[in-house]
Amino acid sequence: MPTSIARRGLESLRRLALGASVSETFARGNALASFGWLTLVVKTLFGANERRARASVARVVAGVLSAAYLVLLCEFVAGSSSASPLASFSSLEGVSRLFRDERVVCAGWLHYLAFDLLIGERLSAIERENGVSRVFTVGVTLPLTFIAGPVGYLWSSACVWLTRRNRR
């Protein structure tokens, strides 16, 4: 009984705050992340001295995405009696079973969007502090981080290393 009440409460919270369905939550998350990335690009190009403004927009967007992630995760856990008992993070098969639930897929996507945006914001700041060209940051680092986060991180690390090395 308490589990069904919690599940209904979480579902109502998600519907009220995030959308009528998990698909709508997914779409809203994408739109919000796009806004966050666009703001990050514009501020990186034109607001070199506005680090706080750039950081706050990216962090607020990531915070909202994180809250949506938390609601979906709690909703899944509250309704997990229907989930496979073999679903876990200890094996590839277990993770595959977890991702059969659309709430988990959407939560995973929101997790990806939030973290990559936070990493993109941080890489932008690090590159600016180390004198990496904004053209490289906006033209290469941010798109790579958006599409393939770890690749953007590696690219940025190489750019910063080369920039520091060339200064000596």
Where are these regions (language model features)?
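Hydrophobic transmembrane alpha-helical segments in integral membrane proteins
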Residues: 13-35
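Short aromatic-rich membrane-water interface segments that cap or initiate transmembrane helices
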Residues: 94-107
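N-terminal signal-anchor/start-transfer transmembrane helix
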Residues: 30-50
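Hydrophobic, aromatic-rich membrane-embedded alpha-helical segments
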Residues: 138-161
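N-terminal chloroplast transit peptides
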Residues: 1-12
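Hydrophobic alpha-helical transmembrane segments of multi-pass membrane proteins
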Residues: 107-114, 143
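Loop-to-helix transition at the N-terminal end of transmembrane alpha-helices
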Residues: 50-71
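Transmembrane alpha-helix/helix-exit interface in multi-pass inner-membrane proteins
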Residues: 66-87
